[in-house]
């Protein structure tokens, strides 16, 4: 059947050729098999003719067939041809090894290599590079070292440049960079392949600086054999990108242009990638235009580069251009734009782009949904973020849970953050280090001591990456808990950064150990850490706590001498420090010297005047604040009400309290406490009572105590009894309220009622807490 399908005359010809000289046969078959227009089907027909013609044992013919089948991606057919040959030489073995190696079947190529060794055939300088490279691709280190030993044992070709380059590549690929360098240094001659292998090895193993060093050595060698090729330059640009070495990258760009390599697609692509990652959107844009046939990766890179530089308008222009050219965006480029919109807090644009995502059905892409969730968390649009989270969290999206956890932390929703973490634990979802930091910080803010300690155990138990952020949040947690021993131990064991120092200094200040905080600052400076504004603000708080004007002045001099940036927070802290340490003139001098003043600066200056009893100056400054179009805040009115209380300015205080509504400032418990104190001290007890009854929340002990004390002072015992009874009803477990009620009854001469109040206290199981002295 086969013979009927094939040309009979070709079979006859082959039979005649088989009796002719071997060299003539080889040449004739070679001409047939080297025909590039030969299809796979024709190749198989010729193979059949060769078998029927009795030439399957011909090594040269077999090697040609093996190579031809390999070029069609059919190494399995190459193996069939190989197995028909009984007497095999090194040329045939190399052919079958190459057939599988070139098609990515590295394990099979190594199997043939070991079969070759078992047959007694020794490898040559063509075999070794393929076998070693196969070991590199499979990361079979021990097999590769065995081959290295075999090469050294046989000798003769271990000093071959191709063999040496393959071993450099192998050791680099397996992560043994030092061994790769030893092999490279021992090579008597090095070609561009060897140089590229050692440069690439350094870059791939995170030693980009060393890679650039070898590139410079290669350039210094100066011979044509050592001249960098496009692949070498690609590695060089990658190294520059990893190091952020803009100057060196530009030099490499110039070298590529000078040596005619800039037109290479390898060079253009790597050059574009370098400029994109190095934060040079203009040069990245020019490189992008030189690419010509842009793919989705290059479009994504240029759009991301422009977006990261803050040029969102140009970034979106490129996004629309990409679509006009027939390129359909994928989830990666969509997510990239969403992430940058979130970072830049472009809320209207972010919402509009969300509409584009929905219209083009990208809302089903988990990567896009996670980016949208992150964006809305950054916008602090809690309701939208929660709605989106409810939709995507049902799909078991681990990243979404972590994003929402971090979002709650960012939006100061500490209770929700902790509740979500508990739910995550119940579902068995893993959290990342950033999420752990958010939960630990939430525990610090709401005083969840036990949960905070449990989180520390969780971090250790789950072998979570103990990043510096996690350590800093734990130091802050233990500092706020008052456990300075653990906080200090973690500080000493950590790879500290400025934030770590800040956390430890803040812990000392929080625990009222300001002297230790100041001493730690001195150590921080001596160890060449540059304090941040947060460090200095915290230290000024320590100076306030200790009343140390001298130390505060030293910190002020440090700020001036080091030319530290004087931002609004630091300026406000200095004004506050001088005011609270008794140097009101200096405080006002700094206030007047400030070019920009936010509400905090105005507040601390007003508070300073109130603290020193200069109510007129405080109110005058408030009037200036209104004229400067700075909106007063809650602390502004609290400082003013406190000043009016101490000065007894009832009408002025009432006007200020009513003025809060004008600025949409909702009074809190402290504002009401000041107003009640102001009214009570002036004898306006009925108005004070009316104020307490109209409060939108329950009074605390301070308000009840203020009101009852004034009732006692002004002899309003009936009102005092009425207020005390309400206080007891509001909090039956507060021993102070029972005592105040009993005292009020006693003052009114109602001894039986006083005794009954004490009896109620005993029946409720409330005992009077023992007094203590702070001396």
Curated annotation (Swiss-Prot):
Residues 1-17 form a transit peptide. PPR repeats lie at residues 58-88, 89-123, 124-158, 160-190, 191-225, 229-263, 264-294, 295-329, 330-364, 365-395, 397-431, 432-466, 467-493, 497-531, 532-566, 567-597, 598-632, 633-667, 668-698. GO terms for cellular component: mitochondrion. Its main location: mitochondrion. Residues 703-775 are annotated as: Type E motif. It is found in: Mitochondrion. PROSITE patterns: PPR (PS51375). NCBIfam families: PPR. PANTHER family: (WILD MALAYSIAN BANANA) HYPOTHETICAL PROTEIN, PENTATRICOPEPTIDE REPEAT-CONTAINING PROTEIN. Belongs to the PPR family. PCMP-E subfamily. This is Pentatricopeptide repeat-containing protein At4g39952, mitochondrial. The gene is PCMP-E98.
């Amino acid at each position: 059947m086969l013979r009927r399908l094939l040309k009979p005359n070709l079979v006859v010809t082959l039979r005649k050729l088989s009796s002719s000289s071997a060299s003539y046969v080889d040449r004739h078959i070679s001409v047939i098999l080297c025909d590039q227009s030969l299809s796979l089907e024709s190749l198989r027909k010729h193979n059949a003719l060769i078998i029927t013609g009795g030439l399957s044992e011909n090594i040269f013919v077999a090697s040609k067939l093996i190579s031809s089948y390999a070029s069609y991606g059919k190494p399995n057919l190459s193996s069939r041809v190989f197995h028909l040959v009984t007497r095999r030489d090194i040329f045939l073995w190399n052919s079958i090894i190459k057939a599988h190696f070139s098609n990515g079947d590295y394990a099979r190529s190594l199997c043939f290599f070991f079969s070759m060794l078992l047959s007694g055939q020794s490898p040559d300088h063509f075999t070794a590079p393929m076998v070693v490279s196969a070991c590199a691709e499979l990361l079979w280190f021990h097999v590769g070292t065995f081959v290295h030993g075999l090469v050294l044992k046989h000798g003769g070709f271990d000093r071959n440049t191709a063999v040496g380059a393959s071993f450099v590549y192998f050791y680099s690929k397996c992560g043994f960079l030092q061994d790769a360098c030893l092999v490279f240094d021992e090579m008597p001659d090095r070609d561009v392949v060897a140089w590229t292998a050692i440069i690439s090895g350094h870059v791939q193993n995170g030693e980009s600086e060393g890679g650039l060093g070898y590139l410079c050595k290669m350039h210094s060698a100066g011979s044509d054999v050592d001249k960098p090729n496009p692949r070498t330059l690609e590695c060089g640009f990658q190294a520059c990108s990893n190091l952020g070495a803009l100057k060196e990258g530009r030099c490499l760009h110039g070298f590529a242009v000078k040596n005619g390599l800039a037109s290479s697609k390898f060079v253009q692509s790597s050059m574009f990638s370098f400029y994109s990652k190095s934060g040079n959107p203009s040069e990245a844009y020019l490189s992008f235009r030189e690419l010509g046939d842009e793919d989705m990766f290059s479009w994504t890179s240029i759009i991301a580069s422009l977006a990261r530089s803050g040029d969102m308008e140009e970034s979106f222009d490129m996004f629309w251009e990409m679509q006009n050219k027939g390129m359909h965006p994928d989830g990666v480029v969509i997510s990239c734009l969403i992430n940058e919109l979130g970072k830049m807090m472009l809320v209207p644009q972010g919402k509009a782009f969300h509409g584009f995502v929905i219209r083009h059905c990208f809302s089903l892409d988990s990567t896009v949904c996670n980016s949208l969730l992150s964006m809305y968390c950054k916008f602090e649009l809690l309701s939208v973020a929660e709605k989106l989270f409810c939709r995507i969290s049902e799909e078991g999206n681990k990243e979404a849970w972590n994003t929402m956890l971090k979002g709650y932390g960012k939006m100061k929703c500490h209770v929700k953050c902790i509740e979500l973490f508990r739910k995550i634990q119940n579902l068995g979802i893993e959290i990342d280090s950033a999420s752990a930091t958010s939960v630990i910080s939430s525990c610090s803010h709401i005083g969840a001591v036990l949960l905070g300690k449990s989180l520390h155990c969780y971090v250790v138990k789950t072998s979570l990456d103990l990043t510096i952020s996690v350590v800093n949040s734990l130091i802050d947690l233990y500092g706020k808990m008052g456990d300075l021993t653990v906080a200090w131990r973690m500080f000493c064991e950590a790879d500290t950064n400025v934030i770590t120092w800040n956390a430890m200094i803040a812990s000392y200040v929080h625990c009222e150990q300001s002297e230790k905080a100041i001493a730690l600052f001195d150590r921080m400076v001596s160890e060449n850490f540059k304090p941040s504004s947060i460090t200095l603000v915290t230290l000024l708080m320590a100076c306030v706590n200790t009343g140390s004007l001298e130390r505060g002045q030293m910190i002020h001099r440090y700020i001036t001498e080091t030319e530290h940036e004087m931002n609004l927070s630091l300026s406000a802290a200095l004004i506050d420090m001088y005011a609270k340490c008794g140097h009101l003139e200096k405080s006002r001098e700094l206030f007047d010297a400030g070019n920009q003043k936010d509400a905090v600066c105005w507040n601390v200056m007003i508070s300073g005047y109130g603290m020193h009893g200069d109510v007129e100056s405080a109110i005058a400054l408030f009037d200036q604040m209104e004229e400067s179009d700075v909106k007063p805040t809650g602390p502004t009115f609290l400082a003013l009400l406190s000043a009016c209380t101490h000065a007894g300015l009832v009408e002025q205080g009432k006007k200020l309290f009513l003025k809060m509504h004008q600025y949409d400032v909702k009074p809190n418990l402290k504002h009401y406490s000041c107003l009640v104190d102001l009214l009570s001290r002036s004898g306006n007890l009925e108005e004070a009572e009316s104020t307490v009854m109209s409060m939108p929340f329950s009074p605390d002990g301070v308000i009840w105590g203020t009101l009852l004390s004034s009732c006692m002072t002004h002899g309003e015992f009936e009102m005092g009894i009425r207020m005390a009874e309400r206080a007891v009803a509001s909090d039956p477990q507060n021993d102070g309220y029972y005592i105040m009620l009993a005292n009020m009854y006693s003052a009114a001469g109602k001894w039986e009622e006083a005794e009954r109040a004490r009896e109620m206290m005993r029946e409720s199981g409330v005992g009077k807490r023992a007094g203590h002295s702070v001396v």
